[in-house]
Amino acid sequence: YTKGKNATEMAMLIDAMDILYGERMDGFCLVSSDSDFTPLAQRIRQEGLTVYGFGERKTPTAFVRACDRFIYTEVLRKDDKTAGTVTPKRKVYSTRELKQDTRLVNLIRNAVEDSADDNGWASLGVVGQNVTNRSADFDPRNYGYKKLGELVRAIQLFEIDERSMDNSPAHNIYIRNKKRRTSNSD
């Protein structure tokens, strides 16, 4: 065997193709920040399988977009609380910073519009799926928030309605764009 990065990548590619054609899988997980895996992700998706990508923020956009879902590994790291270890805190974006992120705001607004009922309300769960379908690397943790609901609240550009579920302590969250006020009472 030849040693080195390219030899390792080639061996991984051969293994992936063997698995793709030899066994029935529901999806693949590719952990890399290397754009060399972009064609592999595209080929796997052509076969109708889901591709989950994991990599660092430096991952090239082409590879991120080739995946159905892409998660930056930085958001997966837990704060290390062991003695003598200092782990930098993840940045939590302020309301002002979030509102200025036009890509983020438009992504969520468009997802709300596409998922909304006649009064403009959309289930947060459906909005989340819609956002993920539009942007493979979307994750509220990229902005310092654990959940989409926390991020939406922090942006402060959406009305939020928590609706009780029958015979359950749980509730469903619905949101709508604040800009979209109708003259009808909702």
Question: Which residues are covered by each model-predicted region?
Answer:
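Terminal and domain-boundary accessory regions
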Residues: 1-186
